Design a protein with these regions (language model features):
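Extracellular/periplasmic bilobal clamshell ligand-binding domains
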Residues: 324-367
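Extracytoplasmic ligand-binding site segments that recognize negatively charged/polar headgroups
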Residues: 46-60, 72-86, 94-239
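Bacterial N-terminal signal peptides
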Residues: 9-19
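A ligand-binding cleft/hinge motif common to bilobed small-molecule-binding domains
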Residues: 105-109, 244-264
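Short, polar/charged alpha-helical segment
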Residues: 29-40, 44-70
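Periplasmic-binding protein-like
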Residues: 183-192, 215-221, 225-228, 232, 260-286, 300-324
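A bilobed periplasmic-binding-protein/Venus flytrap-type ligand-binding module shared by bacterial periplasmic
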Residues: 157-164, 200-204, 277-290, 309-313
């Protein structure tokens, strides 16, 4: 009799659980349909975008076809777009709905002003809210929950010209101090937030700040390395043979030129790589002009459908585990045995703190 009672109670709990889940699912579906309808009434979406050129048409076309909502895009560098949002908010103008930038740029240049909204309350679709679908088994937010990391890739620190550089001739950062590389290195400017600052800051975590500064000084003074802030030029000039090596390149630009057949290759070094989102971070300003359209876009973009499109457009692997890295260069995909440093918020904070150190080294050479 007790056994029968136990079975009855268990079945009752199970049925209640199923009813609860079914009801929760129905509520979520109703909320989604209501939000989509409201978004269609708004009719448009404004995105501030720092990404490779091919991302813009891919996003606008797919979202318009899927929901009938037009996307208007403002492009620029991370610092430019951040300054624009801060300036607009300071003037009481709320024009941006979504911003795509690097995580450190979003957090440091916009989030610290309180101009980013928490993302989790916007997430409606179960497949997006499910932490198990994402790298690390959890939703990839910063601590404030306002910057969502949707790209996760191994960041190759070197691009080289295959006509003038033999494969495996550069295996360590220290190899670039050899005489044969004098006047042949083009690095991304480490004195601003970006790939260069990310790269030298990683070395500072490995070696300590003093040794990293000495290394940067050696490259700039003894090796007479050139500096650029133009990501396309950085890789293009190596492909054209003006320089043999691009140090700390933009991954999207590197992938584009490799796939186009330029005489370049990317390589990892023995010191390991940073597992980075690059500019693959999404934020929603605190007062979006079209809040429902922003919510629909965020859910769609972070879904399997949206991330499949993102992989094709960015040519970098998604942080979603159920999205394949088809078409992505193997050097950008984190291998199971690969030595990587997972870029995190603490690293981003140190990176920002160290910018004046790198700037001082760069300026000492330019005097």
């Amino acid at each position: 009799m007790n056994g029968l009672k136990s079975i009855t109670v268990t079945l009752a709990v199970l049925v209640f659980g199923l009813v609860f889940l079914s009801d929760a699912g129905a509520q979520g579906e109703a909320q989604w349909e209501k939000t989509v309808a409201a978004a269609k009434k708004e009719g448009e979406l404004s995105i501030y975008l720092n990404a490779p050129a091919q991302v813009r048409p891919a996003l606008t076309k797919a979202f318009d076809e899927r929901f009938g909502i037009k996307i208007y895009v403002v492009t620029g560098t991370g610092p430019e777009l951040s300054a624009k949002i801060v300036s607009e908010y300071s003037a009481g103008l709320y024009q941006a709905d979504v911003s795509f930038q690097g995580c450190s740029t979003l957090i440091t240049l916009i989030g610290t002003h309180g101009y980013l909204a928490p993302i989790e309350p916007m997430l409606i679709l179960p497949e997006v809210r499910d932490g198990k679908a994402w790298f690390g088994g959890q939703l990839n937010y910063d601590k404030a929950g306002t910057a969502f990391r949707f790209i996760n890739h191994a960041l190759p620190p070197v691009v080289y010209n295959t006509d003038s550089v033999k494969a495996n001739s550069i295996q360590s950062f220290l190899d670039l101090q050899r005489p044969e590389w004098k006047k042949k290195i083009l690095m991304h400017d480490p004195s601003i937030l970006g790939a260069g600052a990310n790269g030298i800051s990683y070395l500072a975590t490995l070696w300590g700040l003093s040794k990293a500064k000495d290394y940067l000084s050696t490259l700039l003074k003894a090796q007479e390395a050139a500096v650029t802030r133009n990501y396309q030029q950085h890789v293009e000039w190596v492909g054209q043979g003006k320089y043999a090596v691009a140090l700390w390149p933009n991954p999207g630009q590197a992938a584009r030129y490799v796939k186009a057949g330029a005489p370049i290759a990317v390589t990892h070094l023995k010191e390991g790589a940073v597992a980075s989102p690059a500019f693959g971070c999404l934020g929603v300003p605190a007062k979006p002009a079209h809040p429902n359209a922003a919510t629909v876009f965020v859910n769609w973009f972070l879904s399997r459908e949206g991330q499949t499109l993102a992989v094709k457009a960015y040519e970098l692997p998604s942080a979603r585990l159920d999205v394949t890295a088809s078409g992505v260069l193997k050097e950008f995909v984190i291998a199971p045995e690969q030595k990587v440093f997972i870029e995190n918020e603490e690293f981003n904070a140190m990176q920002d703190k160290w910018i004046p150190e790198w700037k001082a080294v760069v300026e000492s050479v330019q005097r």
